[in-house]
């Protein structure tokens, strides 16, 4: 039996029995009990490999695999519970794009900056850059993925501009340092690997970064910048 088959066989045993003792009992025959007259001794002989009707499984292997399967199960449940976009009927390309990036932004594998230009509830033209991972941690996105509200830039985001009121605000976030005094335009430095994200549409976005324009009916303009950190953690 090769390693892969052995692991598969162990998984079958681990999922079939709640405890190692239950597995040992399944390997004990009525003949064993008749001659040994001691269930504990019979279990010990099975554990040592002297008795049993199947493959010998060590206690430490059983318990380690049992723990690993349980950890994986809990992680999957937590992930399903955490992903706000899961199971939603997404009606727009923009929401689909956010859903595709939600898990990786929550885990830190990816860092996305969202540019949005549109009008607010007062009819004023606004635009701004949103640190997606930070907003995911500080806000419930249920209302956005269900379509009850639109995601819009705020004065608390990494960059915000109200064109009608001529108000410009920038704020560094846990993920990005804002470089607002650059003569060639706004820059963001990703704090994890110190790489620069250039949001100028005429320039390259930077190392390990991409720029994607989203065709959407929700906004006048929507662009997503994706940055993958190469720094080892």
From Swiss-Prot:
Cytoplasm recorded as keyword: yes
Keywords on record: Cytoplasm, Nucleus
InterPro entries per the UniProt record, alphabetical: DUF4464
GO cellular component, one term: cytoplasm
Subcellular location: Cytoplasm; Nucleus
Cystine bridges: none
Function recorded in the entry: May be involved in spermatogenesis.
Protein name, UniProt field: Cilia- and flagella-associated protein 299
Organism listed in the record: Homo sapiens
Gene of this entry: CFAP299
